[in-house]
Amino acid sequence: MCQHTQLIVREYRPEDLPALVRIWNEVVEDGVAFPQEELLTAETGAAFFAAQTYTAAAVDADTGTVYGLYILHPNNVGRCGHICNASYAVERAARGLHIGEKLVSDCLVQGRAHGFRVLQFNAVVASNTHARHLYERLGFTQLGVIPVGFRMKDGHYEDIFPYYHTL
């Protein structure tokens, strides 16, 4: 991705699925941010992304190349169903290019548009400092700390931080 690329964030399309699955699996394989351990296949990925309230892709407006994604869904049910949760993934080669900021900013808009009142992150890993700084810069509030709440790929445990943002 070059600096002149026009990046847009839009709802995913079926043709995005191979890239979405690949990017999601990169983050799962890294083992330092997502709690999932199982990789998505083409079939499980299609079902997974379709089951979300909203799935977005960050794409090059000219080429359609997908560089990142997010999923948005309820964090709970019933009386807490107005609180949503999201996960973000950026292709390894495109990290550090502020794609995450575009994804989170769009997610805040989509959360509101889908009737949610709060966006909550349950488990931001302590060592994920880039994400933590981004969330704080965008107005998220850290709720506390859950000691040794995340098992890293190498087997050691790290603290996790819940965050929220009113919509």
Task: Please annotate each region the language model reported.
Residues G96-G111, R132-R137:
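Conserved acetyl-CoA-binding loop-helix of GNAT-fold acetyltransferases
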Residues G111-V124:
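Conserved GNAT acetyl-CoA-binding A-motif
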Residues M1-T5, Y88, I146, M152-L167:
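Terminal substrate-recognition subdomain of acyl/acetyltransferases
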Residues Y135, F140, Y163:
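Conserved active-site tyrosine of GNAT-family acetyltransferases
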Residues A33-A93, V104-S105, Q110, T166-L167:
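Acetyl-CoA-dependent GNAT
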Residues R95, F121-A131, G149-K153:
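Conserved beta-strand-loop-alpha-helix junction that forms the acyl-donor binding cleft
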Residues L20, W24, G45:
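Hydrophobic pocket/interface hotspot
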